[in-house]
From Swiss-Prot:
Organism: Pongo abelii
Sites bearing N6-succinyllysine, chain numbering: 122
Summary of subunit composition and partner proteins: Homotetramer. Interacts with MPG/AAG, through inhibition of its glycosylase activity it potentially prevents formation of DNA breaks in ssDNA, ensuring that base removal primarily occurs in dsDNA. Interacts with POLDIP2. Interacts with PRIMPOL.
CDD domains membership: SSB_OBF (cd04496)
Domain SSB: 30-141
Name the record gives this protein: Single-stranded DNA-binding protein, mitochondrial
UniProt cross-references to InterPro entries, sorted A to Z: NA-bd_OB-fold (IPR012340), Primosome_PriB/ssb (IPR000424), ssDNA-bd (IPR011344)
Protein's UniProt keywords contain Acetylation: yes
One BP annotation, GO: protein homotetramerization
Amino acid sequence: MFRRPVLQVLRQFVRHESETASSLVLERSLNRVHLLGRVGQDPVLRQVEGKNPVTIFSLATNEMWRSGDSEVYQLGDISQKTTWHRISVFRPGLRDVAYQYVKKGSRIYLEGKIDYGEYMDKNNVRRQATTIIADNIIFLSDQTKEKE
């Protein structure tokens, strides 16, 4: 009794390999990045002719772990790895706020997406660049207040 309507509904969501490209349905995917770290340099505002302006800065995140073969976890040596991320802010309001208030040493939390791009360097060699495109920035500390 309900078998036919259920199958019709399921066919809307399930696609088979035999279907052609003309019947492609957009499916959801997720490209989301959450970073918490310290700013490595004051931001720069870049404007390339014919393109949107962008605020760019670097963000350091740290990963820490204990090493050693000790049975007692607390006795191992602490190791740390710092990873640097290139952050690009294109959204007009956020771009201007980031340029004005993000400072070297500030602790921030940001949300965005990862982007893999290519560009030609000065020697006409194709290079790859990974950047985080920020959608939201939360300021957790102000470096100028911490110095006082």
